Amino acid sequence: MKITLKDGSSKEYAQSMSVIDIAKDISEGLARIATAGEVDGEVVDLRTVIDKDCELNILTFNDEKGKGAFRHTTSHIMAQAIKRLYPDTKLAIGPSIEDGFYYDIDRETPLVAEDLEKIEAEMKKIVKEDLPIKQYTMPRAEAIAYFKEKDEPYKVELIEDLPEDSVISFYSQGEFTDLCAGPHLMSTKPVKAFKLTSLAGAYWRGSEKNKMLQRVYGTSYPKKAELEEYLHMMEEAKKRDHRKLGKELGLFMMREEGPGFPFFLPKGMELKNQLLDYWREIHKKAGYVEISTPIMLSRHLWETSGHWDHYKDNMYTTVIDDEDFAIKPMNCPGGILVYESEPRSYRDLPLRMGELGLVHRHEKSGQLHGLMRVRCFTQDDAHIFMTPEQVRDEIKGVVKLINEVYSLFGFKYHVELSTRPEDSMGSDEDWDMATEALRGALDDLGLPYVVNEGDGAFYGPKIDFHLEDSIGRTWQCGTIQLDFQLPLRFNLEYTGADGEKHRPIMIHRVIFGSIERFIGILIEHFAGAFPTWLAPVQVKVLPISDKYMDYAQKVLDELNNSGVRAEIDTRAEKIGYKIREAQMKKIPYMLVVGAKEEEDGLVSIRSRFEGDEGQKSLTDFLAAIKMEIQAKTAREVKKEDDK
């Protein structure tokens, strides 16, 4: 039996071996930290026995899939603790998620925050008991009878939805048994560090028509230090929550009259418009033309594009003159209609069309989250139509543009290349060409990337950009997606140099993604303290008293007439109070004016970056701030010991 490992090396065994035994054979150290295995792409338990040639990857907590097994086990430990403490609890589902895990439960008396400590204490006992975790199966009818006897109606419903000939997978640890496909750890012992973080409501199976359950969230790590680092990040994230800062800084609001539909307030619109102006500026330089397509288009178009069949549940539809229409959830079909509005030649290609299009998608109410998950947003789409020979260079151009944008905001990022999934459309030749073009572009640019085998869209491979914010969280924003299918569906053509008709290749790409979501990310990344060029208010003029109001107004007028976004604080408050409030509003510069300033024609400058910056003439201050704004530089805040 030949086992091929991730690094390309191989091992030969005369008899069948479990994943954990192979891990031990490789290294005792690896076996100690292993959480699961991946056999020919399928994630399995460490106890799984291998009896034929295969490719094997030993997963640890450092692998996303290995992390999932670790945290899924933690969710079972939590459910076991809840059942020990509150036996009347009915269990629903408990998966691992990106930053931890949750379990949905149902009980007459909901849990309160104080209960979480009791549950954690019981979880520690379960970990200390070092309970072996075992997997076994049962026929569907027996599984239903088992959970009916246990009075677990949600488990019964899940099993009843499966085909009659299904064999049902169970996992048990001590007295606790759960319906689960796995994988899980070998025992409860490795789960050394965990924290139950919050309680929330969640509809059963995500439908508002079903009962509201209680969701218990938590996270876990192999080491206490890793948990503490994560919890510190979460505390920092709370302070930076864009919903909280958005309200405090007067940027946007959400109302129950429009759930998932954000209202941008004047300062928020200033911020949004700065981003849109910047987008237009860099795209014009990069050779894009801007278009705008209708917000509502006919059913026929969405049937041709495939959205009506595959995405209709997320679309808002209406009837006009007895014909079905849909508000667009994506900009691509409209862009295609623009492409086919006139004959195209190879001389017209590549054709780069950008659109800041307003799209609407029906997200479930439980998934809405400030600006991060909304039902209406502006997508910074661009669609590039090109010949096969142009694909590689166009991808490189998009990557460079994305790098320019993310670098401006101080984001680090990593890149993932997703290849052909099993369920895909198009020829092997098309897929090989497209994947090699993406891979080659990244290699040409010397950009490190991770390959996600089989994770591309059904219509083409893609590159995803995951940016890292100032507190270490990652956000997937930029995407470059190759598409063979829409040009085929819409029968797009161009006339080649040979005079014959050819099918163009299409790239879908976004940089910000959703402008609204990107604003939410920026609010949290900068903690509301935006670079001067982006700040809704760049300067606050602070007269020491009413006596200097005329001079303060003159300063304000000069600032505004010079294109600097400035406001004045005319309240009869002490200057210290005005300064503190301007600082709370994260305003980059405060200009204090009093007798000396008026007499000498100066302004006293206080900045968010260095505090007291002394006095300057207004002309000199204007020259400096305009240079900072034009260059889009981001001044760093000096630490106390640097001042």
Residue ranges and their predicted role:
Residues 1-92, 97-643:
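NTP/phosphate- and nucleic-acid-binding module
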